[in-house]
Amino acid sequence: MGRDTIAEIITSIRNADMDRKRVVRIASTHITENIVKLLLREGFFENVRKHRENNKNFFVLTLRHRRNKKRPLRNILKLKRISRPGLRIYYKSQKIPRILGGMGVIIISTSRGIMTDREARLEGIGGEILFYIW
């Protein structure tokens, strides 16, 4: 059985957010690079750096937390994996759901690459729903 790299990314980010850590390290692949760029553009990360250590590439993500006097507050409320290796979920462009009335973001793998639900609706293409983030 292969590794589900998308589930590993989601789990790493969720665990760091729940533990209120500011920095997360994830393995670097083409899929993770595209997903990280999207989430950075959507404002879920403050900074992304690519590092190489022992001939292995990885990303160092700085999570965006709101400041409080006692401790940082969580910013990411929920990450949910939808399509998985055992059950793929596909939607046409007209049927792509809206999360929290458009406040959440859906990451979709399309024939034109990985993009958000808004971009897929604008281009009129559907695809595989990878995960929700809100």
From Swiss-Prot:
It comes from the Eukaryota. Gene3D superfamilies: 3.30.1370.30, 3.30.1490.10. Signal peptide: none annotated. GO terms for cellular component: plastid; ribonucleoprotein complex; ribosome. It is found in: Plastid. Pfam families: Ribosomal_S8. GO terms for molecular function: rRNA binding; structural constituent of ribosome. Keywords: Plastid, Ribonucleoprotein, Ribosomal protein, RNA-binding, rRNA-binding. One of its GO terms (biological process) is translation. Part of the 30S ribosomal subunit. Belongs to the universal ribosomal protein uS8 family. PANTHER family: 40S RIBOSOMAL PROTEIN S15A (PTHR11758). One of the primary rRNA binding proteins, it binds directly to 16S rRNA central domain where it helps coordinate assembly of the platform of the 30S subunit. HAMAP family: Ribosomal_uS8_B. This is Small ribosomal subunit protein uS8c. It comes from Cuscuta reflexa (Southern Asian dodder). The lineage of its organism: Eukaryota, Viridiplantae, Streptophyta, Embryophyta, Tracheophyta. The gene is rps8.
